[in-house]
Amino acid sequence: FPYVDNPTLYHAVKNSVKENGLRIFLTATSTDELDRKVRSGELKRLSLPRRFHGNPLIIPKPVWLSDFNRYLDKKCLSPKLKSYIEKQRKTGYPLLLFASEIKKGEQLKEILQEQFPNEKIGFVSSVTEDRLEQVQAFRDGELTILISTTILERGVTFPCVDVFVVEANHRLFTKSSLIQIGGRVGRSMDRPTGDLLFFHDGLNASIKKAIKEIQQMNKEA
């Protein structure tokens, strides 16, 4: 991102390479087009599926949650989701919670602050002015729960974090974004494990493909 699925950038890179030059694509989440070129022999694929600490990637656990929006509309938290958050908070590990939309993320923050008054809760999105400060506060332990849109799906590391994705079957959570989100868990030598929960009201192709691809990477490792 923003290279993926952008024909203009692909064309610009292709035209910039010397006649005998090489193009190397580095990605944690391949695309259908790159996979097609590998199958046709146009590209060769090299995989590094194992993490630096040698432990496997965390497999997402799908969790059925059908009443999220119904309770959110009432400015309440689904009892089932609340129960999972309560259980997670007893561990003492930070919780990174992904919401599908900015408005829902803002609503979640307000509700969680009311339901969990002892927690320090933040929310970040593409329009959050102090996003970097909140991210650092979460990393430093000054925030215990951070709610985010897909803006934090990649490029950040939070030691020992657990991740919940609410409405994981939402159209904005693609296979690639779910894999990237899952990659936030288990990155630390101190805790190479963690909880990775995909809350949904219907398993879709993105969730299934993300789980399958993560399982395949573990097999290759």
Give names to the regions the model predicted.
Residues 99-103, 121-133, 147-154:
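Conserved helicase motor
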Residues 18-26, 93-94, 142-145:
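Loop/turn-to-beta-strand initiation segments
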Residues 26-30, 49-52, 99-102, 148-151, ...:
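A short beta-strand-to-loop transition that corresponds to the Sensor-1 phosphate-sensing loop
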Residues 23, 74, 78, 84-113:
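Conserved strand-helix element at the start of the C-terminal RecA-like helicase core
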Residues 156-169, 179, 195-197:
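A short beta-strand element within the Helicase C-terminal
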Residues 18-33, 175-178, 182-215:
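Conserved segment of the helicase C-terminal RecA-like domain
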Residues 18-22, 41-44, 117-119, 159-162, ...:
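Short glycine-/polar-rich loops that comprise or flank the Walker A/P-loop
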Residues 1-67, 74-79, 83:
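Post-DEXD/H (motif II) to motif III coupling segment of the RecA-like Helicase ATP-binding lobe
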